[in-house]
Amino acid sequence: MSSFKSKTPSLPSQAVGASVDRDQAVTSNVTDTISTLRWSPVASYLAASSWDGKVHIYDVANDLTAKGVGVIDAGSPVFTCDWNQDGTIVAGAGAGKKVYLLSAATGQATSFIAHDAPIRSLRFVKVPNAPLDIIVTGSWDKTVRYWDVRNTGSPLATLTCKERVYSMDAADGLLVIATADRHIQLVDLKADPNNFKNSTTNDPLKHQTHVVTAFPDGKGYAVGSIEGRAGIKMFPETSSDNSFTFRCHRHEAPAPKGAAKDVTKTVDVWAVNDINFHPVHTSIFTTAGSDGCIYFWDRLAHARFYTFPRREGAISASAFSRDGRVFAYAVGYDWAMGYAKNSPTYPLKLMLHPVADEEVKPRKG
């Protein structure tokens, strides 16, 4: 596998800096770290699931002012959320083993028990000859289940995974599931819902998978790990594909004062918490990490060309709006440094960044 063309991939301060002067903080009553951010596919509504036991929904105006317009109260930490294809339903799930559904039109909320252990991820997906609103849920009970929201009495199908589901994403017929022990399961959603075709491969990275994100066209996926590395994999795999791995959220620590020139260098390694592809310029993607950094990359050029100024806390979640003009990101404690480093004064923010053309347009040459 190849790597990104960057002389100093672990030194974001030497990359071209994205301006955050116009970033807007969302006034919010979120009281704990945001776990997932998802934009409506049809409007400027943003859903934010949180460890505070709620999914908060915001209406974002053109000037990036935002107001709360709805809440799902799950009563226990919510790890994931998503919108259905026409933006009429918001779903959330997490520690309570239930899926919660909120109708955007009526404000009515319903729920159903979906798994025997916490639900780590859910996505609305398209499958052949099936109703519009199919939810796929991935759980620590080592299963992925498919649900028709009109009839949640039993799943349409169940896929047994090799280990606990840690991350999951879907786009254009491809479902990517990352589990414990670095297994990646790839599911062809265009197959018969009762006979989903899937294959299992190993994560190209050496340490535990933290996040997977499908390409917008379903022809591959990105993966990030706890070791400050990420990778790009094509689907289906071929002998001449463009898969590669690269370092990202790593920082060389300054040498102790008076240290010899040949002293062994120390590198701080941070988890990759989230990866997002731009919906218009689909070769462009972002990585967000425990180090408080956000990077913009071009997977075709193998180049990193923008980085945000390092934020004051970990970036726990991020997402592009449906037109790619707004990039939402959350700052909050992600437990990467353990219990001892948590504090009531740790930053807790939801930010909206207006995306400049030069940040996302692929560069020629």
Feature-to-residue mapping (PLM):
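WD40-repeat beta-propeller superdomains and closely related acidic/aromatic-rich repeat-like regions
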Residues: M1-G365
